[in-house]
């Protein structure tokens, strides 16, 4: 016999104070059944009122228990409500148990169960339930088709997606939502031709349909086709929405189409579409990857609610564009507004610390990541590389050894770090250890080792590594990256013929490849070869970069081609909009100093917008020694030691200048001053075998 139960007003179960008589509930339900009323719409039913008061999983389970205990679970409407609530709270297994207890679920209950899985992003279960639904012979329904197609899209399940398409063909009619879902499924599964066919079959195309097709092109790296389709969309007088413009900006990012990206940015502003966080991040990414860091910062500054993703995008942008100090400054500001960084932020900042060898800040960021628990493989690998770049091999090795699972990225981080800081033998030893631990290297590993061999000047080791790379197929699969490192190795080891042979075998040469070969000719004193290859590069419509101009200017300087050097230096900032770096100014100073045009060289040093470094001063003082212009040398010495009073390398330059003029006493005084200040010269070494 059913008993009356008083429900406690305990907060834990989420109920208000209420007494419910289940005898009354049963009588009401029986009355409704006798009247022929549908319990799907029995909003006033006590059972439904009870379930509607459930505000958490505990209260729902208690109510479920009460209904089961009183024999009220045979009704399909109550089961449907329970399934819906379990799905809403994220307990799909409980929902499925209720569903399976109904011997003959109606179509509405099937749809509710399907919606539960969709709501909780259980796409595999959506596809399984859809198959089961079709086997039961239920009628076709647009909502069911849409949810099943969405699940196939998320799973990249092309086979089941095609099955649904075949079932759709048998349906007399269905709405555009289903067709757009089908289009989206094909596009995201890489079947762009099938997606385009579906697109052409849609007669009334709305903005969602157009955007899905454009997004399909962009996702499959057919960005130009996506932009053409957008023009067709405009011709059809369909206005884009936030997602349309987000997709178009992504296309411009992939194409490095800065001008087009700016145009879409302008369209966004004119359209009055509110810039969401997602759109702002897309704009930041576009400007950053197109090298327009100033516009990226402008977008960042203009947005009132800057979230973690935007901060991170801006910091990563500065780091990748070489503006490391700005990246680190922004990171400090981010800490000031109490936004907790994530692993991507930390890894990017550590990368920046390594690039400018800021060990102090790198250690501070390391401590912060431990303190607030921001740690993953990317952070560990960035730490290894940062310590290696800062010549802290022991710390780099310690972090590396502490990683429980060393993947290929971890090995590459320490090998490339050691290669770049001059610890060549350690890098080669780690490579041998990597092989002994059965870790398969990749193109990045081999490229780092070629750089190590180039620094070591070891033609024999590098040639063996070349043979190893051919055996493993790296020159075929990673031809540009590995091939460029290989030709650079041969060029630096004095074998330009082998370098040119490798250069000619690389089918898709990038700017770095051309620059490496141009630099290789320059290192051998073949300025004509460098300049001819540079002109060939321009004819191939390859845009030079800063490294290309460094190689060209260096080649002109070593062969006394002053007029040509001046022409290329001027072209660099006038024709290509590059801001000269310290390296470019050093090349110009070296070229003029070698040619005896020391007054012009001094004028460059004094007017440089950035601080000259030891190489720049060294190039000038070397010219002073060559042409016995010690009067000009004295001017630079004063400027140099005022700027760098505690750097031994500058004192060595001064001592060498005095020695070249036979002023041995003054050279000795400089050496004694170094000892008094505790400064010592770093020992040099030969890099040729």
Curated annotation (Swiss-Prot):
PROSITE patterns: PPR (PS51375). It is found in: Mitochondrion. Pfam families: E_motif, PPR, PPR_2. Residues 1-12 form a transit peptide. Keywords: Mitochondrion, Repeat, Transit peptide. Residues 616-689 are annotated as: Type E motif. One of its GO terms (biological process) is response to oxidative stress. The keyword Transmembrane helix does not apply. The keyword Repeat applies. GO terms for molecular function: RNA binding. One of its GO terms (cellular component) is mitochondrion. PPR repeats lie at residues 75-105, 106-140, 141-171, 175-205, 206-240, 241-275, 276-306, 307-341, 342-372, 376-406, 407-441, 442-476, 479-509, 510-544, 545-580, 581-611. Belongs to the PPR family. PCMP-E subfamily. PANTHER family: OS06G0185700 PROTEIN, OS07G0578800 PROTEIN-RELATED. This is Pentatricopeptide repeat-containing protein At2g03380, mitochondrial.
